[in-house]
Curated annotation (Swiss-Prot):
Top class in the EC scheme: ligase
Family, similarity comment: Belongs to the SAICAR synthetase family.
HAMAP family: SAICAR_synth
Swiss-Prot/TrEMBL catalytic activity: 5-amino-1-(5-phospho-D-ribosyl)imidazole-4-carboxylate + L-aspartate + ATP = (2S)-2-[5-amino-1-(5-phospho-beta-D-ribosyl)imidazole-4-carboxamido]succinate + ADP + phosphate + 2 H(+)
Organism: Sulfurisphaera tokodaii (strain DSM 16993 / JCM 10545 / NBRC 100140 / 7) (Sulfolobus tokodaii)
Entries under Pfam families matching the protein: SAICAR_synt
Gene Ontology MF: a single term: ATP binding
Region forming the signal peptide: none
Protein name as catalogued: Phosphoribosylaminoimidazole-succinocarboxamide synthase
Keywords assigned: ATP-binding, Ligase, Nucleotide-binding, Purine biosynthesis
Functional pathway: Purine metabolism; IMP biosynthesis via de novo pathway; 5-amino-1-(5-phospho-D-ribosyl)imidazole-4-carboxamide from 5-amino-1-(5-phospho-D-ribosyl)imidazole-4-carboxylate: step 1/2
Amino acid sequence: MEFLKLSEGKTKEVYAYDDSHVLLKFKDSITAGDGARKDILEGKGILNAQTSAFLFRLLESKGIETHYIGMFDERTMIAKKLKMIPVEVVLRNIATGSIVKRLPIKEGEVFEPPIIEFFLKDDERHDPMLNYYHMEYLKLMTRKEAEKIEEIMLKVNEILYPFFRSKKLLLYDFKLEFGRVNDKLIIGDELTLDSMRIREEGSGRILDKDLYRKGADLETVKKAYEEFFKRISE
């Protein structure tokens, strides 16, 4: 049975499923630098689909609503059909990545409470940071919606951070995207090593897409993705 392709991004394809659901097919592509560097990492799509499904199920079990419904096949997720908001929301527990370049903050500083940032999804403009005023002016979301999203992000962190610590992993930061259904905000997109920074507790070993960003070979990246999924799912 063939399904109508609705859209295709760097790492996923979206297909129509029924009136209220879509299929998210995870591709084997891996990218960095707003798509400037691209490769095919065999098996990554399956790993990311399974990782996202596992973590969405974890969130759902704790009362956090996501778009996850179930799996269509090993690399394809059945999800609620959302009107997605073109904003990436990042929660940072420990400083790394762009924040240490943008601000006088040192690598490894611990944020208590966590820092939450909003970025416009726009590769050409390199995903500029947004504040409440920008988002209201651009009609992306109201201030009340932004505050609700911040509340959800903190709740997600309260679930994920201790869960990963129980696996001897540190959640440095993570990114989520949100959509609306009947004016309700719901977590959409994915929750994978493409959208989280994970370090091994103690050693500081990188177990996420930062390996690829820093030039590691594809086999090393794949082994990290495999190890991460094995550790969280055991």
